[in-house]
């Protein structure tokens, strides 16, 4: 496909505008959503500096507490979830939030048997984001629980989800992964959803974790991948013990790992299970995380799966409907010592600015998290020590992770959600009833191939010790600063509003599809590359929009590539979202 160029003749307006304004540039319809400063006072660190993030969960009306159903039997699933998602379910231009919820694990158990009873009714929750202008301070977030109207009921013991428009009707649909039967929910477009699992042929009763919608065959519709974990039966719950001989949670090595699933979208509302013929089902693994991307530079979307305690999988897309596991050859199956690790969550980004995507994986305490630098041609190298990311991670068990440029300086940073999986004796001896809590972490990319931990200046929420699992990212208040949602096990949600990016320039692109590659050329000739994606992290869905931090620069050129098609915009305005039209010359679209 040819390349199409378009020049912007638009001047950025310094005034705050809420909503969208239609314009035309070379016949291409775009909308500009101008930046607005988030309302509210700035939280400060102990040194008096403005904290990088502020917890705004309560003031924004985002009240949710996870229930894991624990009754003292140490059932393995109860400490593994939850994830959740950030996506625009109603198409109004802002991000809504979806929460996965637990339940009692054994039939016949009652809520009064739970060690941590819950006051709210059980079930997944959907919160609608009603942004409102609060002049002159900017835009305020206000969330409304619309779960009942949405129709979600009996959604199982929740783990994670995937969000994507599988039928091309313009509305985002959901695939919910569970300990137990997974569910496919179609978005009707009127604020409600319907369970169409049987009709789509995507049911799976095994223990699934992370999932993703991805167009593996480049036919314009979204296919579906689900990572499966291990075989666990509550009726055959094995007993495991801590070093003190006290009861403790078992690890995945006590169980048989599963194979993953891949379904091809037929384009008629149904899916074909191609797990076996694609090659995906050839290898077992205790899958916890999955991320899609072109990891060998051949233009096709591949799948990388983080396995817990076993070699990871890098499924390279051959382009003929089959995949080959290239993890061992590529250097991403094991760590630098040749050992498998307890891989949980994962992130991909061009962390070193050399034009290709590197990989970062979270692991169990005492293993260290792992940074795989992309050497090109499908080869990777473990650079965890050299990036200074290994040592600070040793005390923690990490799950969700996000490559987020939290200060908009153009370098992708790392936010990490932590929480133990074995009883912490230091907490247990103090009488802690759920001694798995750990603080989360924030790392700033120095731009020289290394990172520095900046957790101490990240804000009060990063000083808390909780059992964090899922982590999702997105610009919730349209200020160009990407925010965080942290999903805690047996605890409250944390909405962490980004305050660190204020004053830095940025360029946002909305209307992107998962897999789109974005390139921005700055005025100093620096090239910034990003990939639109919703997957990665752990059991979570993030915003598909792309925000590119520019620091103090402006943009000379914006290029978007999709399935070999390419469009280029000259002199794009900054500090705005450019909303791509549904049909752009040069870019393939969904039917």
Residue positions per predicted region:
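Short, conserved, GDST-rich strand-edge loop motifs in beta-rich repeat architectures
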Residues: 100-119, 228-255, 417-435
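Blade-edge beta-strand/turn elements of extracellular beta-propeller
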Residues: 53-56, 137-151, 192-202, 269-281, ...
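Beta-propeller blade termini
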Residues: 81-91, 128-129, 158-168, 172, ...
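Hydrophobic beta-strand segments that make up the repeating blades of beta-propeller
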Residues: 95-101, 169-178, 224-228, 303-307, ...
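Beta-propeller blade signature
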Residues: 122-130, 258-265, 316, 373, ...
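Asp-box/WD-like beta-propeller blade repeats and closely related beta-sheet repeat scaffolds
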Residues: 147-163, 177-216, 226-253, 257-259, ...
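Gly/Ser/Thr/Pro-enriched helix-cap/hinge segments flanking short amphipathic alpha-helices
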Residues: 42-45, 49-52, 60, 70, ...
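Repeat-based blade/solenoid architectures
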Residues: 62-83, 120, 150-162, 201-212, ...
